[in-house]
Regions:
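Catalytic strand-loop segment that frames the active site of acyl-thioester-processing enzymes
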Residues: 1-32
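Short beta-strand edge segments in extracellular beta-sheet folds
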Residues: 14-16, 111-115
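Hydrophobic beta-sheet segments that form the core/acyl-binding groove
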Residues: 66-101
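Residue-level structural signal for beta-strand termini and adjacent loop
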Residues: 97, 110-111
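C-terminal output/interaction extensions
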Residues: 113-128
Length: 128
C-alpha cells in the first residue's frame, strides 16, 4: 500500500493532571499543555499512514506549525485528526486539528519523512 493524499488518522485522549502546562513545565496553569496537544496531533499523523508503512520503515517528524487556540481543563476528552495533504517523495505533509468537547483547540500543518528505522537509529546512536 502507498501513502496517498486524503489518508486520515484520528486519536483520542483524556486530559490528565500530568498533561497540563504546569506539570509538563511549560506554564503555570492546570490546563492541557501545548506539547501534549502536539504529541497527540503527531500521533494522529502516524495513525493516518500506519497501514501503508513497510515494517522496516517509520516516519519522523521534521516540521510543525501549530496554533493552540483554546484552553482545555483536566478531565475533558481530546480528539486529534490528521489528513495527508501532500506527498513529495519521502516527505508527507499533514493538516492537523485538535478538539475538546467544546470545539476546536488547535490547528496547523505537520511534515514527516519516511526513513529506514535501523539506519535512523544507527545514525542517532553513532553520536555516543
Amino acid at each position: 500500500m502507498e501513502i496517498n493524499v486524503g489518508m486520515r488518522g484520528e486519536v483520542f485522549s483524556f486530559v490528565e493532571k500530568e498533561d497540563t502546562a504546569k506539570e509538563v513545565g511549560c506554564g503555570s496553569l492546570l490546563v492541557y499543555s501545548t506539547p501534549c496537544m502536539i504529541a497527540l496531533m503527531e500521533g494522529a499523523a502516524c495513525e493516518a499512514i500506519e497501514e501503508a508503512m513497510d515494517e522496516s520503515k517509520t516516519t519522523v517528524g521534521t516540521e510543525l506549525n501549530v496554533r493552540h487556540l483554546s484552553a482545555t481543563p483536566v478531565g475533558m476528552e481530546i480528539r486529534a485528526e490528521a489528513i495527508v495533504t501532500a506527498v513529495d517523495g519521502k516527505v508527507i505533509t499533514f493538516e492537523v486539528h485538535a478538539y475538546d468537547e467544546a470545539g476546536e483547540i488547535g490547528s496547523g500543518t505537520h511534515k514527516r519523512v519516511v526513513v529506514s528505522s535501523q539506519k535512523f537509529l544507527d545514525k542517532a546512536y553513532a553520536k555516543l
